[in-house]
Amino acid sequence: MLIIEDLRAFEVLDSRGNPTIKAEIMLSDGSMGSAIVPSGASTGKKEALELRDNDERFGGKGVLKAIENINGTIAENIIGLDAFNQTQLDNTLLELDGTKNYSNLGANATLGISMATARAAANALGIPLYRYLGGANASVLPVPMCNIINGGAHANNNVDFQEFMIMPFGFSSFKEGLRSVCEIYAILKKELAALGYSTALGDEGGFAPNLANNTEPLDLLMTCIKKAGYENKIKLALDVASSELYKDGKYYLEGKVFSNEDLIARYEELCAKYPIFSIEDGLAEDDYEGWIKLTQKLGNKIQLVGDDLFVTNEDILREGILKNMANAVLIKPNQIGTITQTMRTVRLAHRNNYRCIMSHRSGESEDAFIADFAVALNTGQIKTGALARGERTAKYNRLLEIELDNDEYLGDKL
């Protein structure tokens, strides 16, 4: 048994220049592990609490309170625990906090410790993180959902939908699929410039031009896919983030007002016209009636992903499964607070034939933990932004490294 011998946490910066937590764990054999916690912009109401200082520093976004919790209460209670018993560690963190959403210690504090301990344990054994967390069956490279046009809360433009993504299905390897996305991304930049559109980037590395409506990005993507020579090998995915468009039971976009039935009809039209594989957060997190209707209409045709709807929460997902809402769940560890709770949600989804998509947050870092985690849990899909900005490419580069020892790419088998 190796025990947690020491730990520390301190402020670092995320990709938006906001403070976040870096946690470091030291084990009794001298092994170490560290982790940097991400942060979201478009967040679900039921996410675990990200503890911020709310004072004059960094416009209130400092995390010194959470760091004090790590270096104080958490350290006092986990030093001496078995580093290889992740469940015991994470249960201890949950019990220490005393709430379901980590409103005392902060989910950013607990997740940092949870991630760093897993990494330290893997380092102690001299094995990759994905192998430590996933065992012998962790070997499948996920299909990336590459967000190459940004809108909504991730960009300062007039596009309502938050993410327009491409997914490389028709390839035999992850690296070839990634290459196709890189080539399409480069063509898109030239296409936007030729049309006189901005090629400025959004939070996740995608382009963020002002466009006529929410279908022009889809037309642009189809043009670029064709120019790159990858027709029939690439599918499209959307993150509508519709909770951001929802007010008083209605949806406000493109200068119009939509009921949930109107919006569902809009999605049906889009799916008939474009090769759309997936729609995320197609309806607001509180619009349960709408989600049931959407799943009845499109659930047998495309992937319907709940992000704000489920917030990586096992209990909320279980309720959604019983109500037949969505058929897939986005997996964001910082929505729930520990590695163990994240894994439980994935297992519940898989037992009920719900797909899983491992996901970054818009406020990210160079930490590539989720790349290993996606392979460990065989999620089959990963969202980690565009092929630009180092905090995004860090995850892709880690997956390329993992592929050197694992040559199975899900691709068309998804």
Swiss-Prot record:
<feature type="binding site">
    <location>
        <position position="307"/>
    </location>
    <ligand>
        <name>Mg(2+)</name>
    </ligand>
</feature>
<protein>
    <recommendedName>
        <fullName>Enolase</fullName>
        <ecNumber>4.2.1.11</ecNumber>
    </recommendedName>
</protein>
<keyword id="KW-0963">Cytoplasm</keyword>
<dbReference type="Pfam" id="PF03952">
    <property type="entry name" value="Enolase_N"/>
</dbReference>
<dbReference type="InterPro" id="IPR000941">
    <property type="entry name" value="Enolase"/>
</dbReference>
<comment type="similarity">
    <text>Belongs to the enolase family.</text>
</comment>
<dbReference type="InterPro" id="IPR020810">
    <property type="entry name" value="Enolase_C"/>
</dbReference>
<keyword id="KW-0456">Lyase</keyword>
<dbReference type="InterPro" id="IPR020809">
    <property type="entry name" value="Enolase_CS"/>
</dbReference>
<dbReference type="GO" id="GO:0000287">
    <property type="term" value="F:magnesium ion binding"/>
</dbReference>
<feature type="binding site">
    <location>
        <position position="280"/>
    </location>
    <ligand>
        <name>Mg(2+)</name>
    </ligand>
</feature>
<keyword id="KW-0479">Metal-binding</keyword>
<feature type="binding site">
    <location>
        <position position="361"/>
    </location>
    <ligand>
        <name>(2R)-2-phosphoglycerate</name>
    </ligand>
</feature>
<feature type="binding site">
    <location>
        <position position="362"/>
    </location>
    <ligand>
        <name>(2R)-2-phosphoglycerate</name>
    </ligand>
</feature>
<dbReference type="GO" id="GO:0004634">
    <property type="term" value="F:phosphopyruvate hydratase activity"/>
</dbReference>
<keyword id="KW-0964">Secreted</keyword>
<dbReference type="GO" id="GO:0005576">
    <property type="term" value="C:extracellular region"/>
</dbReference>
<comment type="function">
    <text>Catalyzes the reversible conversion of 2-phosphoglycerate (2-PG) into phosphoenolpyruvate (PEP). It is essential for the degradation of carbohydrates via glycolysis.</text>
</comment>
<feature type="binding site">
    <location>
        <position position="239"/>
    </location>
    <ligand>
        <name>Mg(2+)</name>
    </ligand>
</feature>
<feature type="binding site">
    <location>
        <position position="162"/>
    </location>
    <ligand>
        <name>(2R)-2-phosphoglycerate</name>
    </ligand>
</feature>
<feature type="active site" description="Proton donor">
    <location>
        <position position="204"/>
    </location>
</feature>
<feature type="binding site">
    <location>
        <position position="383"/>
    </location>
    <ligand>
        <name>(2R)-2-phosphoglycerate</name>
    </ligand>
</feature>
<dbReference type="GO" id="GO:0006096">
    <property type="term" value="P:glycolytic process"/>
</dbReference>
<dbReference type="InterPro" id="IPR020811">
    <property type="entry name" value="Enolase_N"/>
</dbReference>
<dbReference type="InterPro" id="IPR029017">
    <property type="entry name" value="Enolase-like_N"/>
</dbReference>
<feature type="binding site">
    <location>
        <position position="332"/>
    </location>
    <ligand>
        <name>(2R)-2-phosphoglycerate</name>
    </ligand>
</feature>
<keyword id="KW-0324">Glycolysis</keyword>
<dbReference type="InterPro" id="IPR036849">
    <property type="entry name" value="Enolase-like_C_sf"/>
</dbReference>
<keyword id="KW-0460">Magnesium</keyword>
<dbReference type="Pfam" id="PF00113">
    <property type="entry name" value="Enolase_C"/>
</dbReference>
<feature type="active site" description="Proton acceptor">
    <location>
        <position position="332"/>
    </location>
</feature>
<dbReference type="GO" id="GO:0000015">
    <property type="term" value="C:phosphopyruvate hydratase complex"/>
</dbReference>
<dbReference type="GO" id="GO:0009986">
    <property type="term" value="C:cell surface"/>
</dbReference>
<comment type="pathway">
    <text>Carbohydrate degradation; glycolysis; pyruvate from D-glyceraldehyde 3-phosphate: step 4/5.</text>
</comment>
